[in-house]
Amino acid sequence: MKKYCFAVLWTLLIAGTPPAAIHHYLYVAEPGVRNYLQYGGHGLLVFDMDNDFKFVKRIATGGLDDKGQPSNVKGVAVSLFTHCIYISTIQSLLCLDLETEKLVWEKKFENGCDRMSVSPDGKTIYLPSFEGDDWKVLDARTGDVLHKIVTHSGSHNTLYGPDGKKVYLEGLHSNYLTVVQTSDYSVSRTGPFFNHIRPFTIDSRQERCYVNCDSLLGFEVGDLHTGRMINHVDVKGFQPGPVKRHGCPSHGIALTPDEREIWLADGFNEALHVFALTATGIRQTGTIKLSDQPGWITFSIDGKYAMPSTGDMIDAKTKKVVATLQDETGAHVQSEKIVEILFDGQKPVRAGDQFGIGRRGSFLK
C-alpha cells in the first residue's frame, strides 16, 4: 500500500499542477461617465466575462482632483510588458500592477491628460494633454516624457496601430485625423472630414478609418493611404436630438473584430445602429435599443460581445442584450473606459482595447 501511495504521489509531482484555464475579465474604470459617481462609484471594477459578467471585485485606484474628489477618468489601456493597467484622468496618469493590484505610480502632467494608448509591445504610451495642444510620448515603465508632438488640435483620443508603426491622434478642434510615424515622429493627416472628428476606429491593415463627426448622426470613412475622405454615411429612419453628453449625435463607433460590421452610437435615440460592410458598399441593417444614451463602444477580442458604455452587454451575433453590468450593491454600472484582459491564473496574458478595432489581420488575431 505504501509503495502504491508513493507511486501516485511521484506521478503527481512529475506531472505538475494542471495548467489554469484562460479566463476573460472586463476591467471598468470609474468614474467613467464624466465624474458622475452614480454609475459605479470610484475605482477599477472587475467583471467575469465567462460567468455572465458577474461582479468580481473593486480595486482601489487614485486619480483625485485638488479637492480630494474622484476625477473624470479619460482612458484605460494595458501593457503586458509591464503587467500594468494605465488609467488617465483629467489631471494625471495612473499605473497599477495587475498582479499585486497596487498603485505603482501616479503622475500629474502640465495641461492634464486625456485618452491615451499603449504600444503593442507595451513599452510606450502616447498621452494627450486635456483637450490641449500636444501629445506626450512616455516610457511605460516610469511615465517619463521621451518626446512631445504639438498639433494645436484640442488633443483628445489616441489609438496605436496594431503593428506599432503608426499612432492615430484625434483633436476636438480638427477635421483631420493626425497620423504619426513612430520611427521618427513625422506627421501626416487624413481628411478633411464633415466636421470636427470625435471617436474613431481603424481596420487591422490600417487602410481605413471610420470616424464620428460633430453634428453628424452617422459616420465617415477615410482612406489612410491617400489621406482622403471617401464615404459619408447617414443613419436612416432616425432623427438626431438633444444629447446628455459630448454635444454630438454619434459619439462612439466600433468595427466588429472580423471587420464585417460597423456599430454606431446614437445618443438621443438611446441606440446602436449596425451597418454591414460589403463589397458593394455600406448597408444599414438594424438597430439595438439600450438602457441609456451611449457614449462609447468596444468589442470583446473574440467578437462575441459588443460592449457599449451603457453597461448593456450585447451578443454580437443575435444583437440581443444578454447581461447588464452591476456593482457589488446591485447598482447599474456605466463607463466609457473599459478593457478586456485575459488571465492565465494570476498572470495577464492578453489584452483587448478600449477602441473597437478591426482584428482580421495577423497582428491582432
PLM features: residue spans?
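Predominantly soluble domains enriched in secretory-pathway, periplasmic, or organellar proteins
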Residues: 16-365
